[in-house]
Design a protein with these regions (language model features):
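Active-site neighborhoods and metal-handling regions in enzymes and metal-associated proteins
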Residues: 1-249
Length: 249
């Protein structure tokens, strides 16, 4: 396994890809209101990414039919943005990415439609997953090892009532959306490859509210919880530094 150190020019292109992605995220978040369909959110992201001269990297990836993955309530990952409309209190996770001049970005956010007052249980869930993400980002610093990232994420989830979906991982990113290394959301300190400044990673805890067992929806894409409880995904892409992950998006 080889984890590349990026050059300044490569990092400039990755930051640009991330800037475009952040613009798409911000536009979608403004439309995360009751009555808006997942398909409409997909169109917003697609328009912004393409109008900026970038390419949506999810579209066509292993045959995926959309620009975003949209996960609603018991969806966990790989959700097709279909005609379902957002309702007050829903938990939504959106994963998206862009390619700028051959270099990738990839990030995910979660939110409760209507905010925490609309559903305090779901607000607590997704903010805990975000806390785990940020703990992993903090551990992604030069001199640490890959296992330190997983340990940091797992420590947050272990101290919560939630469960890691361990079959899904973070990853390296660069010329391809998914590169070495696999970044597990669990692990032991002081294990795995040594982290160096300039490595570019996606840190991506994927968590179930209840039992972590999942299944594939009949549409062949959406991964959903078996017990019908919620799933949640948060993800940042960025660069390893001496003080943790420099978050691009």
């Amino acid at each position: 396994m080889r984890i590349e150190i990026r050059t300044p020019d490569q990092l400039k292109k990755m930051r640009k890809a991330a800037d475009i992605l952040r613009a798409a995220q911000a536009a979608m978040q403004k439309r995360c209101i009751p009555g808006v369909s997942l398909k409409e959110l997909d169109g917003i992201a697609d328009d912004i990414i393409r109008s900026a001269g970038a390419i949506p990297n999810f579209y066509g990836f292993h045959g995926f039919p959309a620009t975003i993955c949209a996960m609603l309530n018991d969806d966990v990952v790989h959700g097709i943005p279909d005609a379902r409309k957002l309702q007050e209190g829903d938990l939504l996770s959106v994963d998206c990415g862009a390619i700028w001049q051959g270099w990738h970005s990839d990030a995910a956010f979660s939110l409760v439609i209507g905010g925490g007052k609309a559903n305090a249980r779901r607000e607590k869930f997704h903010t805990t997953v975000k806390e785990a993400l940020l703990a992993g980002c903090d551990a992604a610093r030069e001199g640490n090892q890959l296992g330190d990232i997983g340990y940091a994420i797992e420590s947050v989830i272990k101290n919560s009532p939630y469960s890691l979906c361990k079959e899904y991982t973070g990853h390296g990113i660069g010329r391809e959306m998914h590169e070495d290394p696999h970044i597990f959301n669990y692990g032991n300190k002081n294990t795995g490859a040594r982290l160096k400044s300039g490595m570019t990673l996606c840190i991506e805890p994927i968590v179930a509210e209840g039992n972590p067992a999942v299944k594939i929806h009949t549409n062949g894409w959406n991964v959903v919880t078996v017990d019908g409880k919620d799933g949640c995904q948060w993800e940042h892409c960025g660069m390893v530094t001496s003080t943790g992950l420099e978050i691009f998006a």
